[in-house]
Amino acid sequence: MVDEKRQKAIELALKQIDKAFGKGALVRLGDKQVEKIDSISTGSLGLDMALGIGGVPKGRIIEIYGPESSGKTTLSLQIVAECQRNGGICAFIDAEHALDVYYAKRLGVDTENLLVSQPDTGEQALEILETLTRSGAVDLIVIDSVAALTPKAEIEGDMGDQHVGLQARLMSHALRKITGVLHKMNATLIFINQIRMKIGTMGYGSPETTTGGNALKFYASVRIDVRRVATLKQNDQQIGNRTKAKVVKNKVAPPFREAEFDIMFGEGISKEGEIIDYGIKLDIIDKSGAWLSYNDKKLGQGRENAKIVLKENKSLADEITAKIKEQIGSKDEILPLPDEPETDE
């Protein structure tokens, strides 16, 4: 027990801090109910489960990284679409100047109400980010990508000039400024990042690293490694990619969980494919030869045909999804990775 004299000193300090910095700047955990962390769905059932809270956490920094064409931007745009469906305001800072508006619309993004910026320099991009964050009106901001946040000095300099560590210092400074504001405004920030190969690893440790220095690794609450693991074909035609997402860092739930899902060309993440994969794995969907069925009702012959049935029958898809979530929740364990799906030939 704290003696009376020290207790009065603490109360006085609390009052002074509240007066100087606002009520709630310093609280006793026992006096404040610990709130459940809000999240934004990723559009992937498996990844939402792997993240532990049903999606990416609000008020935090997220890093999505991986090799080229692995599905990083697609995953980010799916999160934007999910946020907008729930009434959120989203911004996309397109530092790469490569946003495909038509593709974003196909993924379900409300492009009419999406705030888009194509900045000229890294400083401009991060100033826009800070202004949007401090406004308190934006729920989700995506920056594509860290590698494209080129410092002004580098753009205005000559081609052969050396600018060692300039981008890393720029990122470190920006992250120090906005981390607290993001939490206060309950806004989520997603950085899309690329992979580079380290020089001189000599076989020790991973030869891969991400761009922009180490600051983002420390400030990010969640880091997701996205990789393409297989090509999906139908009648010898490539129709999409099988993608694996690994949560390599997670400050809000246990890390190192993985999820696999299909990214279909022109459509994005196949929710129906995940429902089928996890449904079979958990014995919710029956598989007899090539036929798939649920509660004695045939869904179709082959995975792709069953996906079409679920896509056309949303209530049925929602019912199976609810059963999957219920089973996973009751088991209180890491969501099992589904077996690699068979492609319809």
Swiss-Prot record:
Annotated GO biological process: DNA recombination; DNA repair; SOS response
Subcellular location: Cytoplasm
Gene Ontology molecular function: any one: ATP binding
Keyword list, A-Z: ATP-binding, Cytoplasm, DNA damage, DNA recombination, DNA repair, DNA-binding, Nucleotide-binding, SOS response
Stored PROSITE patterns: RECA_1, RECA_2, RECA_3
Primary location class: cytoplasm
A Pfam family matched in the record: RecA_C
Keyword Plastid listed: no
GO CC annotation: cytosol
Domain of life: Bacteria
Cross-referenced PANTHER family: MITOCHONDRIAL DNA REPAIR PROTEIN RECA HOMOLOG-RELATED, RECA
HAMAP family reported for this sequence: RecA
Function: Can catalyze the hydrolysis of ATP in the presence of single-stranded DNA, the ATP-dependent uptake of single-stranded DNA by duplex DNA, and the ATP-dependent hybridization of homologous single-stranded DNAs. It interacts with LexA causing its activation and leading to its autocatalytic cleavage.
NCBIfam families: tigrfam_recA
Family in the record: Belongs to the RecA family.
Protein name (database record): Protein RecA
Species this protein is from: Helicobacter hepaticus (strain ATCC 51449 / 3B1)
